[in-house]
């Protein structure tokens, strides 16, 4: 991916698609919709070697699918306590459809705003997810992939290109560590976010500490679905733009930006209201305000220092260099 970034972004235009200043400007104002699929395709690349032939091979294993018909069938089975499936493939199919039904209202709202066909998009999402888990039987089913599939279908529309980028995005980034429940990785991220809250949002850190609220209760939720269940999709698409460049560091920066924006309410509201705020922010969340706050939070040096030292044998020295952060 780094080689592609270098080709995409350089000091000048001679051998690059964009020069560095143009690139920063695009990312600051948001990549135009008509350019997003080109940039994502370049940045994600295809390290897993997903070809059209591979996609077609697995596509042929899927029965003709219409989301609305399958939804009606599943709901009837649930209402009448009928068996949901007889084999592994049926069980996978039913899990996907049930989780898509639970997310349908969110998708419909976004698709209405974007003037997209709901039934067609949802059928494509199902196909992408089903093929992904057919190919990666080593990964336990995880409903968060529905949100990722929705994002990639919105950007690419074409089924093969959407799947190729979705598969490579998940399997060649740390996102997969949330899908497989890598506890060491997740616990390290929780610890880092606690430390960052203490440093950058001390009022909320102290308030949460007094209420015995652990950041684990919301940060893991944010990170494992890349904020797709928390923010509206205009913001989400721009977050994915940035994530493809900055990677995991951006997740912590976004989390701090949300807490900073909502700080006044978070330190004055009771626990149940705090979780409502942190789980699902209003659809009319101001896009420009969000990215202005994001720009103000610079964690780059602290983040790199933490990651480098926790990856080396002197991890203990780093942990002892600050007072232990606990909730």
PLM region spans:
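Internal, helix-rich recognition cores of eukaryotic regulatory domains
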Residues: 1-285
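C-terminal regulatory/linker segments that are acidic, Ser/Thr- and Pro-rich
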Residues: 22, 256-327
């Amino acid at each position: 991916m780094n080689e592609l970034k270098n080709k995409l972004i350089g000091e000048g235009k001679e051998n690059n698609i964009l020069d560095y200043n143009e690139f920063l400007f695009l990312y600051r104002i948001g990549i135009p919709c008509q350019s997003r699929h080109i940039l994502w395709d370049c940045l994600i690349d295809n390290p897993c070697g997903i070809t059209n032939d591979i996609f077609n091979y697995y596509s042929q294993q899927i029965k003709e699918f219409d989301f609305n018909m399958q939804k009606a069938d599943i709901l009837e089975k649930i209402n009448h306590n009928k068996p949901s499936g007889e084999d592994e493939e049926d069980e996978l199919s039913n899990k996907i459809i049930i989780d898509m039904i639970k997310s349908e209202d969110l998708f419909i709202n976004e698709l209405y705003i974007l003037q997209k066909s709901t039934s067609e998009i949802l059928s494509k999402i199902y196909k992408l997810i089903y093929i992904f888990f057919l190919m990666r039987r080593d990964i336990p089913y995880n409903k968060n992939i529905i949100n990722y599939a929705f994002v990639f279908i919105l950007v690419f529309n074409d089924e093969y290109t959407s799947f190729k980028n979705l598969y490579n995005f998940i399997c060649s980034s740390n996102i997969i560590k949330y899908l497989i429940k890598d506890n060491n990785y997740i616990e390290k991220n929780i610890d880092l976010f606690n430390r960052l809250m203490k440093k950058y949002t001390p009022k909320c850190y102290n308030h949460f500490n007094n209420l015995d609220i652990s950041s684990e209760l919301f940060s893991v939720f944010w990170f494992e679905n890349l904020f797709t269940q928390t923010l509206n999709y205009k913001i989400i698409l721009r977050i994915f733009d940035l994530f493809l460049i900055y990677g995991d560091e951006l997740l912590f920066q976004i989390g701090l930006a949300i807490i900073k924006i909502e700080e006044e309410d978070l330190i004055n509201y009771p626990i149940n209201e705090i979780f409502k705020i942190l789980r699902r922010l209003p659809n009319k969340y101001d896009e420009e305000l969000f990215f202005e706050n994001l720009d103000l939070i610079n964690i780059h040096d602290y983040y790199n220092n933490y990651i480098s030292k926790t990856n080396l044998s002197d991890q203990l020295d780093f942990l002892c260099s600050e007072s232990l952060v606990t909730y």
